Amino acid sequence: MALRALHAQPTGGPQLRFLLFLLLLLLLLSWPSQGDALALPEQRRSLSESQLNPDELRGRFQDLLSRLHANQSREDSNSEPTPDPAVRILSPEVRLGSHGRLLLRVNRASLTQGLPEAYRVHRALLLLTPSSRPWDITRPLQRAISLQGPHARALRLRLAPPPDLAVLPSGGARLELHLRSAAGRGRRSAHLHPRDSCPLGPGRCCHLETVQATLEDLGWSDWVLSPRQLQLSMCVGECPHLYRSANTHALIKARLHGLQPDRVPAPCCVPSSYTPVVLMHRTDSGVSLQTYDDLVAQGCHCA
């Protein structure tokens, strides 16, 4: 009688508990161990020589390098190449209008001449004279481009200049246009692409250069065990005006260097990003693996 009553109970409850138990077991079995994920930077993992023989130590070193390269390859594959920004220097027509307004006329075709259609004006700086400070007219110019349409042969702007620029301009007005691809707006490429146009000539402007060096060359042979040879990428070259400026400070520095070269130095070619490198070296307690995040340059800019 009791056996029949037991069989008469619904079986959904025990089956559900059994499925939950299997699910929990699968989660525990698939949970990664502490050594499966590589955290950068990985700080000084000390290994006693008595605990690991050279083969095991070399194996761990190779495993660390493999995971590091896998992370880097995954990052590179997910990043899409961004078209390089471009700079245009134009000579607009500027004259004084009524009520102290400045009337600016710019040839529409000269804005993006020689560039793909995807390029748009990112920044516009007007210099009324060679010694005057730049006047940012980005928004008025972008508004004129939008309102006057793509078929207008010339863009006409009516501007109210700041008080210190409210003078009759000379014929040497310049308009500096910074253009970027619409597909890459808001992103700055960390890599130096070979199609960058250097005004000083090929290979003279800020770029990435790789140099092969041994531990003896670096003076590290007494404490670094591996690798015995390094491919060191570094930033070399000059920084002409408006070339690969890292930020607004670099733009101002380049501008002031042109006006006061004795007081303000030119921007320098420095790394914009780095590639992590793992070194195996000796420590007081044995041998250590350490990741260096600022040893090998990956991209360059002027700052």
From Swiss-Prot:
**Sequence similarity:** Belongs to the TGF-beta family.
The molecular function GO annotations come to: cytokine activity; growth factor activity; hormone activity; protein homodimerization activity
Q: How does it assemble?
A: Homodimer; disulfide-linked. Interacts with GFRAL and RET; ligand of GFRAL, which mediates GDF15 internalization and cellular signaling through interaction with RET via the formation of a 2:2:2 ternary complex composed of GDF15, GFRAL and RET.
**Encoded by which gene?**
Gdf15
Which tissues express it? Detected in plasma (at protein level).
Q: Where is the signal peptide?
A: 1-30
* PANTHER family membership: GROWTH_DIFFERENTIATION FACTOR 15, TGF-BETA FAMILY
| Keyword entries, A-Z | Cleavage on pair of basic residues, Cytokine, Disulfide bond, Glycoprotein, Hormone, Secreted, Signal
Q: Does the keyword Glycoprotein apply?
A: yes
- Can you say what this protein is called? Growth/differentiation factor 15
Propeptide residue intervals: 31-188
- Biological source species: Rattus norvegicus (Rat)
